[in-house]
Regions:
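Outer membrane beta-barrel transmembrane domains
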Residues: 257-259, 274-312, 333, 340, ...
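Hydrophobic, lipid-facing positions within transmembrane beta-strands of outer-membrane proteins
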Residues: 42, 78-82, 132-138, 167, ...
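Residue-level signature of outer-membrane beta-barrel architecture
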Residues: 86-88, 98, 140-142, 173, ...
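Transmembrane beta-barrel strands of outer-membrane/channel proteins
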Residues: 48-54, 96-100, 169-173, 230-234, ...
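Outer-membrane beta-barrel "beta-signal"
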Residues: 135-147, 375, 444-456
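Short loop/turn motifs that connect adjacent beta-strands in outer-membrane beta-barrel proteins
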Residues: 32-42, 55-57, 85-94, 143-166, ...
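Surface-exposed coil loops of outer-membrane beta-barrel proteins
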Residues: 111-128, 132, 147-257, 393-404
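Signature for the C-terminal beta-barrel architecture of outer-membrane proteins
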Residues: 196-322, 329-332, 336-343, 350, ...
Length: 456
């Protein structure tokens, strides 16, 4: 880890110098329309989420090691998180998030789907509560004028203000999704959509450990209606593993995102384009399929992929993320991404192409301002190389039914979140999954969920 920290230290200094050189300082004569409150010096916020799910029995003429169990089953996750922060000095903040998590997935293991049904299941490690460090990072802001906007206190955000034009640097232990791929309607599995394809791109194989976090940096440049983000993060030492690969100069995940705000029919919206590129020691499906053909048999582990992890390889993808308000209480969103699909999944899930479109409406429309209703349609696909591997009997990290009658995985999710007081919500959720793990011979699967969420 020392190599990572040394590298990050040099990156921090270099980017700080670049930002200061390129920055346009706020003019002393620039008018300030109001007096702004003193920035909040410290923060301590907490959240608790419990998510219980069950699915009924479904059609399944055959199963293998990584098939979703066709019998009636249930699962749960529980997390308690502290969001602690302090202002080190002007415009510099430090945040620390310890978390306790526990839970058990369907089938006793995280298998059988491309679009998994619970966004918190990667943090669960069984029935014993596990304490771990989720985040530890520094955020530095360089204000660039253009007027100011208020910042309300929130998780990992001290109350205060920021310039509309600014440069923001985040360095340390955090999630790529903390900075990249924002969306007002579909981002948080604790309060919004639960399915993995509902809160980020299903095909976004972003670098992270098995819990979804890593070490690295992200730089944001915000000016007027534009925002540009770039960053580099560490990935797992082995695909979908918990141990981090600290060689961030050799194995890494890079991302670049461009965002433009707009107004359509008098309502705000945003359009984003995100490109990512990962370098890691992973197997190509071509090599893994060749190994299967040379070593025929029935496998219960991703043996072929392990044997084919012979060299470093490049993974990449590009996606579009759009959101558009339809009024003060509702909005729609769209995400679409395509990955290259030539190599095994590195750190997220078994999806090479993803599409999600949805609608969210706030309860103020019917007199319950703290309620919300959401609907999303999702479609996941895999590459022809991954199809051939699975058809040959291959087992990957999350999926593998022994054979494959390929069809895109299709998912619809509907939730209603009922506000209980100001800071608690009870959410009822239904998901229907056709062609689970891209296999038309199995399913459909109906999943019913109840989620409890409180903030303190």
């Amino acid at each position: 880890m020392s190599a990572v920290l040394i590298c990050l230290r040099w990156v921090l200094w270099l980017l700080a110098v670049v930002a200061l050189v390129l920055a346009r300082p706020t003019s002393a004569a620039e008018p300030q329309p109001q007096l702004w409150p003193e920035p909040e010096p410290n923060t301590a916020r907490f959240q608790l989420t419990y998510n219980w799910q069950r699915h009924g029995s479904f059609a399944s003429p055959y199963t293998a090691a990584n098939s979703l169990s066709a019998a009636r089953d249930k699962m749960y996750t529980a997390t308690v998180t502290a969001f602690l922060g302090t202002r080190l000095w002007q415009n510099t903040e430090l945040y620390f998030n310890p978390e306790v998590a526990q839970g058990v997935p369907f089938s006793g293991s995280l298998v059988g789907l491309g679009g998994f049904t619970n966004g918190e299941i990667t943090r669960a490690a069984g029935t014993t509560p596990t304490l771990y460090r989720q985040r530890l990072f520094v955020r530095q802001t360089w204000h660039q004028g253009g007027g100011r906007q208020a910042l309300e206190a929130d998780d990992n955000q001290l109350a205060g203000w920021q310039d509309n034009n600014r440069v923001v640097l985040t360095v340390g232990n955090f999630s790529t999704l903390d900075v990249f791929d924002p969306n007002s309607y579909a981002k948080d599995p604790r309060t919004q959509f639960m399915n993995w394809g509902g809160w980020t791109y299903g095909a976004y194989d972003y670098a992270a450990d098995s819990r979804g976090f890593g070490w690295g940096f992200a730089l944001e440049w915000v000016r007027d209606i534009w925002a540009l983000r770039l960053g580099r993060m560490t990935g797992p030492l082995e695909p979908n593993g918990l141990k981090i690969d600290s060689a961030i100069g050799r194995h890494y995940g890079d991302q670049l995102e461009l965002e433009r705000s707009h107004t359509l029919a008098g309502q705000p919206g945003k359009l984003r384009v995100l490109a990512w590129r990962t370098r890691a020691r992973v197997a190509s499906f071509q090599d893994a399929t060749a190994w299967l053909q040379a070593n025929p048999g029935s496998y219960t582990q991703p043996t072929a992929l392990i044997q084919a992890r012979n060299t470093d390889k490049i993974k990449y993808g590009i996606g579009i993320n759009a959101e558009q308000a339809l009024g003060s209480n509702s909005g729609v969103f769209l995400r679409a991404m395509r990955g290259d699909g030539r190599t095994e999944t590195h750190a997220f899930t078994e999806v090479d192409g993803s599409l999600a479109a949805g609608w969210v409406v706030q309860g103020a429309s019917w007199g319950r301002g703290n309620d919300s209703l959401g609907v999303v349609l999702m479609r996941n696909t895999i590459s022809s190389e991954r199809q051939r591997f699975l058809s040959a009997g291959g087992i990957s990290f999350f999926i593998g039914d022994g054979k494959l009658n390929y069809r895109p995985e299709q998912i619809v999710e509907v939730y209603y979140s009922l506000g209980v007081g100001r800071r608690s919500w009870i959410t009822a959720d239904v998901q229907r999954l056709r062609n689970p793990a891209y296999n038309a011979d199995r399913g459909p699967v109906n999943v019913y969920a109840l989620r409890l969420h409180s903030e303190f």
